[in-house]
């Protein structure tokens, strides 16, 4: 019985440590990145994963956390201003305002960490 209780306590301690480590690792977003996250949630999350772990709802839409592996996210600025037309097949064409672009880029950079 003591061994069983010890195992339970060890499990609880390990899970508590993991939760604490995860909470400490999450840094708060800057106001600009928060606005970018809000934009992404409203306009992009129907197809793309906009977090660090989830798969994209639409399989052909790359998760935002992997964009920096393809090219520097700063390179998206011009495409976002002129309108992205070469995304995945279901992606609508759109153009963003300069402040929206800066906000979205700031958010995308947080996913690189």
Feature roles, as predicted:
Residues 56-61:
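Short cysteine/histidine-rich zinc-coordinating motifs and their immediately flanking basic loops
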Residues 53-54, 73:
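Short, non-ligating residues that shape and space the ligands of small metal-coordination modules
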Residues 63-112:
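Extracytoplasmic electron-transfer domains, predominantly the class I c-type cytochrome c fold
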Residues 36, 41-50, 104:
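The canonical Cys-X-X-Cys-His
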Residues 52, 112-113:
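Activation segment of ePK-like protein kinases, specifically the conserved APE
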Residues 21-39:
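Electrostatic cytochrome c docking/interface patches
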Residues 1-10:
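Bacterial N-terminal signal peptides that target proteins for export
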Residues 11-12, 23:
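Cleavable N-terminal signal peptides
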């Amino acid at each position: 019985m003591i061994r069983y209780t010890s195992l339970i306590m060890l499990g609880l301690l390990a899970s508590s440590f993991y939760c604490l480590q995860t909470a400490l690792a999450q840094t708060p977003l800057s106001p600009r990145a928060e606005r970018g996250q809000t934009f992404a949630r409203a306009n992009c999350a129907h197809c793309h994963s906009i977090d660090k772990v989830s798969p994209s709802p639409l399989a052909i839409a790359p998760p935002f956390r992997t964009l920096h592996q393809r090219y520097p996210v700063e390179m998206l600025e011009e495409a976002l201003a002129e309108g992205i037309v070469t995304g995945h097949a279901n992606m609508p064409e759109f153009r963003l305002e300069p402040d929206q672009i800066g906000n979205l880029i700031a958010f995308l950079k947080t996913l690189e960490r």
